[in-house]
Amino acid sequence: MKNCTLGNETDNSLISNAFGFLRFPLNFQPYSSDADWVITGVPFDMATSGRAGTRHGPGAIRQISTNLAWEGHRWPWHFDMRERLKVVDCGDLVFNFGDAQDMSDKLQAHTEKLLAAGKRCLTFGGDHFVTLPLLRAHAKHFGKMALVHFDAHTDTYANGSKFDHGTMFYHAPNEGLIDPQHSVQIGIRTEHDTNNGFTVLDAAQVNDRGVDDLVAQIKEIVGSLPVYLTFDIDCLDPAFAPGTGTPVVGGLTTDKALKMLRALQPLNIVGMDLVEVSPAYDQSDITALAGATIALDMLYLQAAKK
């Protein structure tokens, strides 16, 4: 239907714009809203190299988030984020199906418009390629940033196509969007280049080291730069997140990931995304629930500063 989607565009998708995260009402005029943070879904998986299906991720995250909406003074924060932070869900980005360039251009423009209006952005993928246009928009507004990146893969591979969910963090430093010397990749457990400047905290050491020790190192690496936080759900072990396109065994537990995430509160996080939830491969919605919980704790990170 027309006039009931982001940008007042006709959306013929069967999987977009169903309901808001955490039962937030959908707001299709986010630029003029009084929101502090705006949630946008990007149902895109054309850049996937393995199993597709992450286009259904935003819907799955929103649907399972209703299980989290009832809790007021949420554990372990002991306050209600909704009383401190104004959050709206503006639904899903509308773009031409089958046109990756159109998605990229529209996501960047949408994000730039939100940032110019004084909003901050939490984005649900979709595959991880969506982070690149998000970084382009944020870098225009904040300048070069530090990247805090949870993933099983570094996504710094130089041999991919223009639209590839494994190449974003090869292109981003080359475009001057992020500073690898002040960026950290967490949970990595696949082959990667060790000479590109990123600090890699591989899954083995993350699983063996304590949270306080790890977070102290992350804070030291990031320094005072504005931070973009991106969480690929395959950072988690497949026992906790089977519903993703490129699962890799030996990953983080949800407990370890959440404890690390919650400890990042002092960082100057200016943008966030949660990507690669693919519900077709999920079991009992545990991947979507992990994603929704991580996204909610991302918002609590911001509310805790109020």
Swiss-Prot record:
<feature type="binding site">
    <location>
        <position position="232"/>
    </location>
    <ligand>
        <name>Mn(2+)</name>
    </ligand>
</feature>
<dbReference type="GO" id="GO:0030145">
    <property type="term" value="F:manganese ion binding"/>
</dbReference>
<keyword id="KW-0661">Putrescine biosynthesis</keyword>
<feature type="binding site">
    <location>
        <position position="234"/>
    </location>
    <ligand>
        <name>Mn(2+)</name>
    </ligand>
</feature>
<comment type="pathway">
    <text>Amine and polyamine biosynthesis; putrescine biosynthesis via agmatine pathway; putrescine from agmatine: step 1/1.</text>
</comment>
<dbReference type="GO" id="GO:0008295">
    <property type="term" value="P:spermidine biosynthetic process"/>
</dbReference>
<dbReference type="InterPro" id="IPR006035">
    <property type="entry name" value="Ureohydrolase"/>
</dbReference>
<dbReference type="Pfam" id="PF00491">
    <property type="entry name" value="Arginase"/>
</dbReference>
<dbReference type="InterPro" id="IPR023696">
    <property type="entry name" value="Ureohydrolase_dom_sf"/>
</dbReference>
<keyword id="KW-0378">Hydrolase</keyword>
<keyword id="KW-0620">Polyamine biosynthesis</keyword>
<feature type="binding site">
    <location>
        <position position="153"/>
    </location>
    <ligand>
        <name>Mn(2+)</name>
    </ligand>
</feature>
<comment type="function">
    <text>Catalyzes the formation of putrescine from agmatine.</text>
</comment>
<keyword id="KW-0464">Manganese</keyword>
<dbReference type="InterPro" id="IPR023694">
    <property type="entry name" value="Agmatinase"/>
</dbReference>
<keyword id="KW-0745">Spermidine biosynthesis</keyword>
<dbReference type="GO" id="GO:0008783">
    <property type="term" value="F:agmatinase activity"/>
</dbReference>
<feature type="binding site">
    <location>
        <position position="151"/>
    </location>
    <ligand>
        <name>Mn(2+)</name>
    </ligand>
</feature>
<dbReference type="GO" id="GO:0033389">
    <property type="term" value="P:putrescine biosynthetic process from arginine, via agmatine"/>
</dbReference>
<dbReference type="InterPro" id="IPR020855">
    <property type="entry name" value="Ureohydrolase_Mn_BS"/>
</dbReference>
<keyword id="KW-0479">Metal-binding</keyword>
<comment type="similarity">
    <text>Belongs to the arginase family. Agmatinase subfamily.</text>
</comment>
<feature type="binding site">
    <location>
        <position position="155"/>
    </location>
    <ligand>
        <name>Mn(2+)</name>
    </ligand>
</feature>
<dbReference type="InterPro" id="IPR005925">
    <property type="entry name" value="Agmatinase-rel"/>
</dbReference>
<protein>
    <recommendedName>
        <fullName>Agmatinase</fullName>
        <ecNumber>3.5.3.11</ecNumber>
    </recommendedName>
</protein>
<feature type="binding site">
    <location>
        <position position="128"/>
    </location>
    <ligand>
        <name>Mn(2+)</name>
    </ligand>
</feature>
